[in-house]
Amino acid sequence: MKGKSLFNVFAVLAIFSLALSACGGNGSPEQPAGDGPKVTSAGFECPEPNPRVEVTSTELNLFVWTEYFPQDMLECFELVYGITLNRDEYSSNEEMYAKVSAGGTAYDLVQPTDYIVPLMIRQGLVQELDHAQLPNMKNIDSNWMDQPFDPGNKYSLPYLAGTDAIVVNTATVETIPTSWADLWNPEYAGRMVFIDDSRATIGLTLVTLGYDPNTTNPDELEEAKNKLLELVPNIKLFDSYSPKTALIAGDVDLGMVWTGEAFIANQENPDIQYIYPEEGPVLWQDNWLILKDSSHLDAVYAWLNYTMQGDVFWLTIRDFQYTNPNQAALDYAKANEPDVYNAYADSPITNPPPEVVAKGFGIEDVGEATPLYDNIWVEVKGGN
């Protein structure tokens, strides 16, 4: 599906989910690698690597999103391979890019969202994948591969995907928003949480003005900046570490969050609802990239293959309910963990309806216009 967009991917998967419905290194236990089953601190029995990659490295350095990895997955990799995972976390693409582009890090793998991938490729920060060392790449649904931001997946592999949309506590908010534009309602002053995502926030603001969310027009961006500054009094906090926490605690009543955060908040409190705005949600995909100076390539390929196994990656469906590109994981969960699978497959949060996807928009690389967006965000964040 050359040249396809995330819009097409979500559309295909939304239709597929309807068909299914119609049919019905951190704190791991100290067990040495070797013979016999390995069990995590939570009692999960670790699947054997298939295939097992030969490694000599003793560590792997990850720079990844916060709250994005099942603890059992992390522990199992350490247990079955005897490799220590060193994991640093970031809460925005911009934070990750700034640190990596400055140099001097020892990271092996990072996890950028789609629009950052071309930038990192252009900057020479990453290396090509060796597909011959990735037999478990076959487990990824082909609809998520060969995206415009990395044709042929020369550099990137999908991890998870999802949407940004409106979240609202229907028990505490009198006027329920149905559009991005509604969030400017003064009734919401000091009551909102927003993920700390410059491009998504500026993009949705552009959409409310009738502009392309990826515009490079300075006049349109200036107009968006001024409108976004009007929204700032409504935002109590920007939080990409765990925006659901403030919602569940009642510190805020509504805002803009990711798929997985909304799912968990709704599970904790059914009054917290995820609303797809009339203008459409933001559609996104997070991906693995190997940094050019990685010194643990054997461990990198061991990690990628192990975590792409269906009997391992299904843990993301259990613990972090984002849209899942790994077909083997979905098949495994459906056959072996039906409650987990059904909660995922039946949710409009993890599987947006086709009519919602049709309105959705993605964030794209804007090239030389990137500093214009950066400057807007500095000014906006200076007011909050």
Feature annotation, model-predicted:
Residues 116-119, 248, 254-271:
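A ligand-binding cleft/hinge motif common to bilobed small-molecule-binding domains
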